Amino acid sequence: MRKIQAKKGLSIECKGWEQEAVLRMLYNNLDTEVAERPEDLVVYGGIGKAARNWEAFEAIEKTLRELESDETMLVQSGKPVAVFKTHEEAPRVLISNSVLVPEWANWDHFNELDKKGLIMYGQMTAGSWIYIGSQGIVQGTYETFAELGNQHFNGDLAGTVTLTAGLGGMGGAQPLAITMNHGVAICVDVDETRVDKRIATKYCDIKTANLDEALKLAEEAKERGEGLSIGLVGNAVDLHQAILEKGFKIDIITDQTSAHDPLNGYVPQGYSVEEAKVLREKDPKKYVELSQASMAKHVELMLEFHKRGAVAFDYGNNIRQVAFNNGVRNAFDFPGFVPAYIRPLFCEGKGPFRFAALSGDPKDIERADEEMRKLFPENEKLLRWLDLAEEKISYQGLPSRIAWLGYGERAKMGLALNRLVRDGEISAPIVIGRDHLDAGSVASPNRETESMKDGSDAVGDWAVLNALINTAAGGSWISFHHGGGVGMGYSLHAGMVVVADGSERAERRLERVLTTDPGMGVARHVDAGYDIAIQTAKEKGIHIPMIDKAGDK
């Protein structure tokens, strides 16, 4: 085992900045400030890994250092399997993680292959090397809670209490996103180290293991109308039950535990983290049974809060499906966050555009933020987000920024970043990527594509087409994964990263990739019949051959 740190500075050890960018983002994924369990190559989300094992990690490193600027490395589930000569505008790396033939696309078969060292769970940005810590999800979480506030609480979360669980790499964004919307958050996690990490990075305000103290603090902050986040150490099922018994009013209920993975992501009721680890290794079958039974109880408690007046939504971890499979027939009585709050943004090709400064210099991100303000002065949501981010976001690993931008905006920003690198206003190349959770890059019937207007929730073609078009357009590294977010059998999704190194070649590639990528989001929603997407496509001149047949489904 090695201790990995994000590499910074202007000297490179690869044969070009593009290969160097891949290496630095791989290191960044495993930086101790960023990854959840770097010693096990686990970045976030249960067992979402950056490489299959340490031997494969070192082979990836070596290959990247030797890779020519007209070659492409192929990575199969975290292991480098081939290098081929391609051309300078082709991707330097193509990645496929955790992809199983549908009949075998389940956790049991995955775990068998994993034990044999034949596969790796890449989550979304873990195995595609573009994870930037909790900031990567915090704006999406902020926008979700902002829209919830607009729909249910007169535009703001002041005077409300949200109860949730899970403070890992994804769930860790919740406390900050809620307080950014002036709400009070009680965030439960059985693993105290996770609470400590969110306190250390200033995503969470206070830690306690005492429920009465947590409720008192929450009530006082609610009465003052102030934002406050409380990391409450304990088991979610136990604590949710106790809160119901005390009759404490919860206004919003959700969950972001790693429920997508019953074996590695969720701790059953009645077990400490240490006890769970022992049982997981000793009797994995029993562990999964207990874990799923706890999830069923967890969802029943969420439904009870909902019945008592709380706004309830699923935050994309597939916990409703597990509960439904274990006898909770009304598990889907509350919606997922995408159909409830996010889909209109997807129809415009908006999604989690992100970039990282390979120099390691925060001033490069400051200059990029300044440029973003100049380019989009009319985008009030974006400007408000940048104000909050500059005030409240602590960088983890390489300095980075997340900013939800739409079709046209992403290409405009990418070209501007390339120009700033070329002119020396930004000191080193910038890596531009996104989460796989995006407008046109994922098929996930219990999350991103839940309740599609035309019933096409489970159609996986769009994620495949996204990876193909971004490869054709010349992304720097392109990935295709299975099972991210919601677990084996429930999702297919693609990722892209493109490097702005200041060159004319980068300019061509940026313009293509940052147009095709969000364009796929618009196309996907046009095809499903969404009027906002149809209007966007017509206004932006996106060529959709059968657009006049859309919108009548």
Swiss-Prot record:
Pathway: Amino-acid degradation; L-histidine degradation into L-glutamate; N-formimidoyl-L-glutamate from L-histidine: step 2/3. It is an enzyme of class 4 (lyase). It catalyses: 4-imidazolone-5-propanoate = trans-urocanate + H2O. Keywords: Cytoplasm, Histidine metabolism, Lyase, NAD. Pfam families: Urocanase, Urocanase_C, Urocanase_N. InterPro entries: Urocanase, Urocanase-like, Urocanase_C, Urocanase_central_sf, Urocanase_CS, Urocanase_N, Urocanase_Rossmann-like, Urocanase_sf. One of its GO terms (biological process) is L-histidine catabolic process to glutamate and formamide. One of its GO terms (cellular component) is cytoplasm. Its main location: cytoplasm. It is found in: Cytoplasm. Its EC number is 4.2.1.49. Coiled coil: none annotated. HAMAP family: HutU. Catalyzes the conversion of urocanate to 4-imidazolone-5-propionate. Belongs to the urocanase family. This is Urocanate hydratase. The lineage of its organism: Bacteria, Bacillati, Bacillota, Bacilli, Bacillales.
